[in-house]
């Protein structure tokens, strides 16, 4: 199926645990939902997501929108963390719990897979969805503050995506936490700062869009359109 002509709009955004700069002092789910609703995308790759947000985001967005998530770190006693994070998000920060999430709009998810990339110093995960076209789209948040570790995470993710795709086109995006990154056999489709999109078997069409998110998050969303390569 993946041989058919296709167009896929991919967005990657680190949500900074649902916080803003300056601090809002309250839950910002409505604002993040509105921002995502206002942008064009087929697949949104999200990092540092409050674990209770993916389903709520999918429900708030015009769709249909499907969500898939994988928990990352600081999720013990999650109901307690959630109660504190909803009330004081800027005080508890990342201790509210963490997840990566993929939202898919207007397309069904045929399969979802996850693989742990490392345990230490924090659990890092790769997650990916297979679309009905056969294209795989992967999402990761690499280790922060350690360039060799971040590159290791990215390489493990690349190898895994090659295995999962089995020759089909695929996309790998997210917060790589390292600059100047290249991945063997993959095309750099676009990015900003440490937030990148790579592709295999697909090519970018048009410009890389760094989207205006106002005060939300400390990362800018990046969107690219991919077509048959």
Describe each region flagged by the PLM.
Residues 61-64, 72-73:
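Phosphate-coordination/substrate-recognition cap region in phosphate-metabolizing enzymes
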Residues 72-76, 145:
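A short, histidine- and acid-enriched strand-loop-helix "catalytic/donor-clamping" loop
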Residues 1-43, 49-55, 64-67, 81-229:
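Active-site regions of metal-assisted phosphoester/phosphodiester hydrolases
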């Amino acid at each position: 199926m993946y041989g058919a002509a296709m167009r896929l709009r991919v967005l990657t955004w680190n949500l900074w645990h649902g916080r803003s700069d300056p601090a809002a002092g309250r839950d910002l789910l409505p604002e993040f939902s509105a921002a995502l609703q206002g942008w064009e995308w087929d697949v949104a790759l999200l990092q540092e997501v409050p674990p209770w947000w993916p389903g709520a985001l999918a429900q708030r967005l015009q769709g249909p929108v499907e969500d898939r998530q994988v928990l990352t770190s600081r999720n013990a006693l999650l109901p307690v963390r959630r109660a504190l994070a909803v009330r004081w998000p800027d005080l508890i920060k990342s201790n509210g719990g963490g997840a990566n999430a993929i939202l898919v709009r207007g397309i069904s998810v045929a399969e979802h897979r996850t693989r742990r990339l490392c345990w230490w110093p924090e659990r890092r995960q790769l997650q990916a969805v297979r679309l009905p076209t056969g294209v795989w789209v992967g999402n990761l948040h690499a280790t922060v503050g350690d360039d060799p570790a971040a590159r290791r995470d990215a390489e493990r993710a690349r190898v895994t995506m090659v295995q999962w795709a089995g020759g089909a086109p695929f996309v790998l995006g997210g917060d790589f936490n390292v600059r100047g990154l290249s991945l063997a056999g993959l095309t750099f489709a676009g990015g900003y700062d440490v937030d990148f999109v790579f592709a295999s078997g697909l090519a970018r069409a048009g410009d890389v869009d760094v989207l205006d998110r106002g005060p939300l998050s400390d990362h800018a969303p990046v969107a690219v359109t991919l077509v048959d390569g």
